[in-house]
C-alpha cells in the first residue's frame, strides 16, 4: 500500500457523507483546513484549495446536507494512532455571539478571554467536542464528535450521551478507553451516568477543592451530642491534610508541550 492510499480512502469516504452540494462542501472543508483564521466564511473562497466562487460557498452552507451519523462512524473507525488503549478528551468550546441578539437559543457561558460588563461571561453558543489524544509528544488531535449544548442542557449529561454513542461506534480493540475531562465537569455525575459503560474516566480537580473522609476515620464516636457527619479533611492545596496514598503514579513533566499524565 502506498503511503497516501489510506488518506485517499478516507477522503473518498468523507465525500460520501456529503449528500447535497457535496463538491462545494468538500472544497470548503479543504479551504478550512489549509487557511489561516479568517474574519468571515466568504474569505475562504479566496483560498487556492477553493476553486469555486463565493456564491457556491454560501449555497453550500445554506442548502448543503451532511450525514452526521455516517461522518461520526467514519471518524470513529479512523483512530489517530495505534495504542494499547484509546484516550479521548472531552471539553466545551464557546462561540461568542454577543451582538447577535436575534440568534436562537443563546446562553451565557464562561469565556477566558472575552468579557461582558467586567465579567468573563459572554452570550453565545456552546459546543462540546470529543477528540482522540495520544501519548506521543505532538500537537495533533483527532476530533470524533461535536454536539451543541443548549441552554437547558447540562454538560455532564451531554458528555454521557456522547461517550456512550462513541463506545457503540468504535471498534472495541485494545484496552479500555480512557476519557479525560477538565475541572468544570462533575466526576460523580459522570461516574453514575457511565457506570455500566466499558470505559474509564479521569477528571481534573480544582486546587481549591476539599473532601472529607468517612466519619469512622476521625476516631471513636462521641458519647454525647450529634454523631459526626464528616471525617478527616482532605484539602487539595494543603499537603499536610493528605493521608498516606494507596497508590502512586509518576507524571512526566514536559514544559514544551504540556504535562502528560
Question: Which role does the model predict for each range below?
Answer:
Residues 55-59, 112-176:
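Electropositive, glycine- and tryptophan-enriched low-complexity nucleic-acid-binding patches
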Residues 60-138, 257:
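Active-site-proximal, Lys/Arg-enriched surface segment
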